[in-house]
Design a protein with these regions (language model features):
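Transmembrane helical cores of multi-pass secondary ion antiporters/exchangers
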Residues: 1-423
């Protein structure tokens, strides 16, 4: 099966599942697509058990074996989804909430990594699961970032007020880049290989240099190429060519970031903010803005559907759920507690500077959905019994956050006086 065949099947399945959700379930698109895909996966497993020799499970395993989820998301879908999200974020609102967003995306991520890692290690030890503290901290790094893809789709549907939208979208856009950097550093220390591509455990100084190069380099590269793209857009008024320029900017910038060893997600977010704000105001005609918004909204919707379809099918990546279900379920409340701590501390520190919205901590805690980035990172680790426990735990947290938190966050927002129709 070639790449086109795989893509054709995925897009067709995403369209069918999206139709089923829109026609019958009427859930938010991300939650609905994931639910339909998950139920379909469970039906395949059930048929395979009830009808011996059906080979449906092996056929599904074979199809998923054609897809490298880590490569598909981290080196494919992610750059387009991040740029599409950043393109519609108000930079002025982001700057106004800058200190809070910075605290959530840095201190918050580090706190979450620590709480998840330590509590997971203790819990696994109590139930006889042999996983080291460093590996549990690595798990904390891959599960801590909130998913900007899921969160921003949610914000559009809920019509959240601008200040809250800037806080949630800003954190989720940046903490995935920080989380990936922390994950790679901890994976190197744990000598897990995979995404980190290591041969020996690095020193603290090497890790510091690595983190600074990834983050600062990503910001600088994103600003530099974002400015080049802005100047190119400003010099002409031809919307097909301008669409091509934005597409080329995203793809070349993301590829270049890997060649020069800086954070691709951070670089793409910075470029998206630049083009979506300064570029939108000063370099685009009304007609161009309309076409670019429509184009990137379509990209966002289509790739989101494919991503959450893949998430629903990745249940087959766990070889034996019976062996790992208990630890996976225990990790869910641990991650919720870690999210609460990682939000409460930066918010408490920011209250010294002035009053913040009532209920901000529970709102940010419950809206911190996890998604494809976490699954891609855990799948990048080498296969082992320990990796299967981490994979099942990651999947449990992602499914809980998208289906339970994603479908109930509207109630949380309404409880604190925000949501559709609020200002």
């Amino acid at each position: 099966m070639n790449a086109f065949d795989v893509a054709a099947i995925l897009v067709a399945a995403a369209a069918v599942f999206g139709y089923v959700n829109h026609r019958f379930l009427r859930l938010p698109s991300t939650s609905g697509t994931l639910l339909v895909a998950l139920v379909s996966s469970l039906v395949v497993v059930l048929i395979d058990r009830v009808i011996p020799g059906s080979d449906l499970r092996s056929a599904m395993d074979g199809f998923l074996g054609e897809i490298d989820f880590d490569q598909t998301l981290m080196h494919g879908l992610l750059c387009f989804l991040l740029f599409a999200g950043a393109l519609h974020v108000d930079l002025d609102g982001l700057i106004q909430q800058g200190w809070l967003i910075a605290g959530l995306a840095t201190v918050g991520v580090l706190l979450s990594v620590t709480v998840v890692g330590v509590l997971t290690w203790v819990t696994f030890g109590l139930i006889g699961v042999d996983v080291s503290l460093l590996v549990c901290l690595t798990f904390g790094a891959l599960i801590s970032p909130t998913d900007p893809i899921a969160v921003m789709g949610l914000l559009k549907e809920l019509k959240a007020p601008p200040t809250l939208e800037a806080q949630i979208a800003g954190e989720s856009l940046f903490n995935d880049g920080v989380g990936v950097v922390v994950f790679m550093g901890l994976a190197s220390l744990a000598q897990l290989g995979g995404a980190a591509e290591i041969t020996a455990a690095p020193s603290a100084a090497e890790l510091t240099v690595f983190a600074l190069r990834e983050v600062v380099g990503g910001i600088v590269l994103g600003m530099a190429l974002g400015y080049v793209g802005y100047r190119a857009l400003k010099s002409l008024d031809d919307h097909p060519l301008e669409l091509l320029i934005t597409l080329a900017l995203v793809m070349f910038l993301y590829a270049l970031s890997f060649w020069v060893h800086v954070s691709g997600p951070i670089a793409v977010v910075i470029a998206g903010l630049f083009i979506g704000n300064r570029g939108r105001r000063l370099a685009m005609s009304d007609r161009t803005r309309e076409h670019i918004d429509a184009f990137w909204s379509m990209i966002d919707e289509v790739l989101n559907a494919v991503l959450f379809l893949l998430l629903g099918l990745e249940v087959f990546a766990v070889a034996r759920w019976a062996d790992v279900l208990a630890p996976a379920l225990l990790v869910v409340p641990i991650c919720l507690l870690a999210r609460l701590v990682s939000v409460a501390v930066p918010v408490a520190a920011m209250r010294v500077r002035g009053p913040l919205r009532r209920g901000l901590v529970p709102i940010l805690t419950w809206s911190g959905l996890r998604g494809g980035i976490s699954v891609a990172l855990v799948l990048s680790l080498p296969r082992s019994p320990g990796q299967q426990v981490l994979l099942a735990s990651t999947y449990a947290v992602v499914v809980f956050s998208v289906l339970v938190q994603g479908l109930t966050v509207r109630r949380v927002l309404m409880h604190y006086g925000v949501g559709e129709g609020s200002h």
